[in-house]
């Protein structure tokens, strides 16, 4: 499962979620401004910005939305399984 760590009022988070939806990728969203454990996880991983996109507890792509949009189509096909 893909997890998008995001915040309210975050335009890059919206763009990342929209791109994943456009590519047909199923994901869950966790808002770190509403979930203190998730916030501590993201900070503990050394991240200071959102979105952060994880798969099975590991960082899927560095750079948030900007890193995600640079991925080739094959990347998204693999995520679909």
Where in this protein do the model-derived segments appear?
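Local sequence-structure signature of Cys/Sec-based thiol-disulfide redox active-site neighborhoods
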Residues: 1-25
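Short, glycine/charged-enriched secondary-structure capping and boundary segments
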Residues: 18-20, 44, 68-69
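Conserved beta-strand positions in the Rossmann-like core of class I SAM-dependent methyltransferases
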Residues: 28
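Short acidic active-site motifs
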Residues: 37-41, 71
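Structural micro-motif
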Residues: 45-53
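Non-catalytic, surface beta->alpha helical segment in thiol-disulfide oxidoreductase systems
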Residues: 55-81
């Amino acid at each position: 499962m893909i997890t998008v760590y995001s915040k309210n009022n975050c335009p890059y988070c919206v763009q990342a979620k929209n791109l994943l939806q456009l590519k047909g990728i199923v994901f869950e969203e966790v808002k770190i401004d509403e979930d203190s454990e998730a916030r501590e996880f993201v900070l503990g991983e050394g991240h200071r910005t959102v979105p952060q996109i994880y798969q099975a507890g590991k960082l899927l792509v560095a750079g948030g939305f900007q890193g995600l949009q640079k991925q080739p189509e094959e990347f998204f096909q693999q995520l679909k399984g």
